[in-house]
C-alpha cells in the first residue's frame, strides 16, 4: 500500500489565528479563559486547550462576571455581542476574518433595505452568527436555504430587492447549483462577485478531488462536527472513492484497506498535522509505504492578532 497526501490540508489561517488567540490569552492573562462554543471544530484541539485552562461554554449566561471570553472562529450574532457589552465582559474575537466579511455584507444589505438569503446548513454556529447580523426591524428578513428544493419553495417579500451570501465552508459544487437556482428564480438578485466560500475550503476541496482520482480509498482527518471536513468526505465519495472521516489513528479499521493499493489522506481546516502524522504511522505499521505529497496550491495568507495579544518584539 502506498500513502498519498493532499496538498494543502489541515489548518488554515483563520483556524491558526483562533487557536493562537486562546493560547495567547492563557499566557497573558492566565486561566481560566472562557470560550463561547468550541473555538474550532476539532476534538483534539479543544481538549488540549481545555487542559491548559480554557473553559468552553455554549452561551454567555454560563460565563461569570469579570472574566475574559473569546468568541469562536465561527462568529457570533449581534445579540451575543450586545449581551457581552452590556455585561462589561472583556472579549477577544476569534471570528475568522473571512466570516466577518460575510457578516459585513449581511449588515449592509439590512441597512440598504434588501432582504437576504443565506446559503448554509441549519444549526451550524457560523450560520447562526451570520443570520444574527441582519436587523429585521426595518421590515426586511433573512432566509436560510440549503439546496435547490429550498429555493423553489422560498417566498420573499420583494424579489427586486434581494441579495445572497454563503456559509464559508460549503461544497463549492453544491453552492454553485444553489446560486444558479437563485438567479433563475430571482433574476434581480444581487450578491458577492464570487461566492463567500473561503480560499482554504476551495483549495482543500480541489486537493481532495485530485486525491480521490488517484487513490483507492481516502481518509479525511477531522471531527464529525466539522463542516468543511464532512464536505471533503462527501466530495471523495461522489467520485466513487470510499472515504472515511476520522478523528485520528484510533478510528482506523484495518479492514478498510483490504485489497487497497493507494491510500489518500487529507485533513479538514481545523485538524492539526500531528493527527495526520499519527494516521501515517499506524498505516505504516500495517505495511503501508511512503507518504508522497501531491502538488497543490501554496497558501501564505496570515491574519493579524488582537493588539493586546500580539507578541512584543524585543
Swiss-Prot record:
Protein keywords: 4Fe-4S, Iron, Iron-sulfur, Isoprene biosynthesis, Metal-binding, Oxidoreductase
Catalytic activity: isopentenyl diphosphate + 2 oxidized [2Fe-2S]-[ferredoxin] + H2O = (2E)-4-hydroxy-3-methylbut-2-enyl diphosphate + 2 reduced [2Fe-2S]-[ferredoxin] + 2 H(+); dimethylallyl diphosphate + 2 oxidized [2Fe-2S]-[ferredoxin] + H2O = (2E)-4-hydroxy-3-methylbut-2-enyl diphosphate + 2 reduced [2Fe-2S]-[ferredoxin] + 2 H(+)
Cofactor annotation comment: Binds 1 [4Fe-4S] cluster per subunit.
GO molecular function: 4 iron, 4 sulfur cluster binding; 4-hydroxy-3-methylbut-2-enyl diphosphate reductase activity; metal ion binding
Binding site for [4Fe-4S] cluster: 12, 96, 198
GO terms, biological process: dimethylallyl diphosphate biosynthetic process; isopentenyl diphosphate biosynthetic process, methylerythritol 4-phosphate pathway; terpenoid biosynthetic process
Classification via CDD domains: lytB_ispH
Record keyword 4Fe-4S present: yes
Residue sites binding (2E)-4-hydroxy-3-methylbut-2-enyl diphosphate per the record: 41, 74, 124, 168, 226-228, 270
Family membership noted in the UniProt record: Belongs to the IspH family.
Positions that bind isopentenyl diphosphate: 41, 74, 124, 226-228, 270
PANTHER family according to UniProt: 4-HYDROXY-3-METHYLBUT-2-ENYL DIPHOSPHATE REDUCTASE (PTHR30426:SF0)
Record-listed E.C. numbers: 1.17.7.4
Binding site for dimethylallyl diphosphate: 41, 74, 124, 226-228, 270
Names of the cofactor(s): [4Fe-4S] cluster
Functional summary from the UniProt entry: Catalyzes the conversion of 1-hydroxy-2-methyl-2-(E)-butenyl 4-diphosphate (HMBPP) into a mixture of isopentenyl diphosphate (IPP) and dimethylallyl diphosphate (DMAPP). Acts in the terminal step of the DOXP/MEP pathway for isoprenoid precursor biosynthesis.
Protein's name in the database: 4-hydroxy-3-methylbut-2-enyl diphosphate reductase
Pathway: Isoprenoid biosynthesis; dimethylallyl diphosphate biosynthesis; dimethylallyl diphosphate from (2E)-4-hydroxy-3-methylbutenyl diphosphate: step 1/1; Isoprenoid biosynthesis; isopentenyl diphosphate biosynthesis via DXP pathway; isopentenyl diphosphate from 1-deoxy-D-xylulose 5-phosphate: step 6/6
Active site: 126 (proton donor)
Cited InterPro entries: LytB/IspH
Pfam families, per the entry: LYTB
Amino acid at each position: 500500500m502506498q500513502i498519498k497526501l493532499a496538498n494543502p490540508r489541515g489548518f488554515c489561517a483563520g483556524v491558526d489565528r483562533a487557536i493562537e488567540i486562546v493560547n495567547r490569552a492563557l499566557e497573558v492573562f492566565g486561566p481560566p479563559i472562557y470560550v463561547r462554543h468550541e473555538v474550532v471544530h476539532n476534538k483534539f484541539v479543544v481538549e488540549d486547550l481545555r487542559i491548559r485552562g480554557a473553559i468552553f461554554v455554549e452561551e454567555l449566561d454560563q460565563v461569570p462576571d469579570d472574566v475574559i471570553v473569546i468568541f469562536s472562529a465561527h462568529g457570533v450574532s449581534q445579540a451575543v455581542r450586545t449581551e457581552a457589552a452590556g455585561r462589561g465582559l472583556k472579549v477577544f474575537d476569534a471570528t475568522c476574518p473571512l466570516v466577518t466579511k460575510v457578516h459585513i455584507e449581511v449588515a449592509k444589505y439590512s441597512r440598504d433595505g434588501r432582504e437576504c438569503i443565506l446559503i448554509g446548513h441549519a444549526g451550524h454556529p457560523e450560520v447562526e452568527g451570520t443570520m444574527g447580523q441582519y436587523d429585521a426591524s426595518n421590515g426586511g428578513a433573512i432566509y436560510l436555504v440549503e439546496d435547490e428544493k429550498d429555493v423553489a419553495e422560498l417566498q420573499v417579500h420583494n424579489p427586486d430587492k434581494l441579495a445572497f451570501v454563503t456559509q464559508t465552508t460549503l461544497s463549492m459544487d453544491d453552492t454553485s447549483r444553489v446560486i444558479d437556482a437563485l438567479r433563475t428564480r430571482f433574476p434581480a438578485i444581487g450578491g458577492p462577485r464570487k461566492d463567500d466560500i473561503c480560499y482554504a475550503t476551495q483549495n482543500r476541496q480541489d486537493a481532495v478531488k485530485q486525491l480521490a482520482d488517484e487513490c483507492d480509498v481516502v481518509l479525511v482527518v477531522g471531527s464529525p462536527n466539522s463542516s468543511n471536513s464532512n464536505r471533503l468526505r462527501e466530495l471523495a465519495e461522489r467520485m466513487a472513492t470510499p472515504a472515511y472521516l476520522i478523528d485520528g489513528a484510533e478510528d482506523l479499521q484495518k479492514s478498510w484497506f483490504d485489497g487497497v493499493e493507494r491510500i489518500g489522506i487529507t485533513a479538514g481546516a481545523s485538524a492539526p498535522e500531528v493527527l495526520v502524522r499519527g494516521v501515517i504511522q499506524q498505516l505504516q505499521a500495517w505495511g503501508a509505504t511512503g507518504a508522497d505529497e501531491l502538488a497543490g496550491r501554496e497558501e501564505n495568507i496570515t491574519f493579524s492578532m488582537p493588539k493586546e495579544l500580539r507578541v512584543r518584539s524585543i
